[in-house]
UniProtKB/Swiss-Prot annotation:
The active site is at H103 (electrophile), E175 (proton acceptor). The keyword 4Fe-4S does not apply. GO terms for cellular component: cytosol. Substrate binds at N11, W12, K13, G181, S220, G241, G242. One of its GO terms (biological process) is gluconeogenesis. Pathway: Carbohydrate biosynthesis; gluconeogenesis; Carbohydrate degradation; glycolysis; D-glyceraldehyde 3-phosphate from glycerone phosphate: step 1/1. It is an enzyme of class 5 (isomerase). Involved in the gluconeogenesis. Catalyzes stereospecifically the conversion of dihydroxyacetone phosphate (DHAP) to D-glyceraldehyde-3-phosphate (G3P). NCBIfam families: tim. Keywords: Cytoplasm, Gluconeogenesis, Glycolysis, Isomerase. This is Triosephosphate isomerase. Homodimer. The gene is tpiA. Belongs to the triosephosphate isomerase family.
Length: 260
């Protein structure tokens, strides 16, 4: 069985500020003392430089811990007349290692199709970033028993355009749309069922990828349900939304992941 390092990625969405970043690092410096889990902070792009500077300033205090920086979005284009967009190279230059791709809010609010998501996945990897690919079903799709069908479609188009081995340098996040920002989380059993399906789906084309890819759960993860979720054999941590804005809660989630 592969030893997959747990990950906790905090997606601030359009929230937070430089003071929140400082508060997080103050707590990290005294509490994160080992590398048994990887922590990723994904602030709004305007605060990437603040987080990068905090990573540099706290390098000694965080010695032994794995704290990285990620972005919430990336353009599928390398450069050009795309007002408001940020390229993969720009994110790489800013110190990012990860970037969230295909979050349900981007798909729903900004019309990001699966084809665009696949292009952004490729753009991220082209510039040395590791994509955190989000997949998940809506409430009606779950009620219609189409969960696996929807997720297979979202995975397959990325595989078709980028190849299975692209997942050797990628993270997958299962985020059921009916649980994102609603306070209603999937049960540990529901999460495990879908994570096992994702792993099996990838294993069918590459046993190595299927065994080694990290799959996070995202959808109203809190300190009260994280231990049971992270204990599932195919759940490798969490993509955290609201709880990532509370330094105490986020630190608790990191600690839980470290002992998972």
């Amino acid at each position: 069985m592969a030893l997959r390092r747990p990950m906790v990625a905090g997606n601030w969405k359009m929230n937070g500020n430089a003071a929140l970043a400082q508060e997080l690092f103050k707590k990290f410096a005294s509490k994160l003392q080992n590398d048994s889990a990887e922590v990723v902070l994904c602030p709004p792009s305007i605060y990437l430089e603040s987080v990068r500077q905090l990573l540099e300033d706290n390098k000694q205090a965080l010695d032994g811990a794995l704290v990285r920086m990620g972005a919430q979005n990336v353009s599928q284009h390398d450069f050009g007349a795309y007002t408001g967009e940020i390229s993969g190279q720009m994110l790489k230059d800013s110190g990012c290692r990860y970037v969230i791709i295909g979050h349900s809010e981007r798909r729903r609010m900004y019309g990001e199709t699966s084809n665009i998501v696949a292009e952004k996945f490729a753009a991220a990897q082209k510039h040395g970033l590791t994509p955190i690919l989000c997949v998940g079903e809506s409430g009606p799709a779950r009620e219609a028993r189409r969960t696996f069908e929807v997720i297979a479609e979202e995975l397959d188009i990325v595989i078709e355009k980028n190849g299975t081995m692209a997942f050797d340098n990628a993270i997958i996040a299962y985020e059921p749309l009916w649980a994102v920002g609603t306070g209603k989380s999937a049960t540990p059993e529901q999460a495990q069922e879908v994570h096992a399906f994702i792993r099996k789906r990838l294993s069918e084309v590459s046993p190595f990828i299927g065994e080694n890819v990290r799959i996070l759960y995202g959808g109203s993860v809190t300190p009260s349900n994280a231990a049971d979720l992270f204990a599932q054999p195919d759940v490798d941590g969490g993509l955290i939304g609201g709880a990532s804005l509370n330094s105490s809660e986020f630190l608790s989630l990191c600690t839980i992941a470290m002992s998972a």
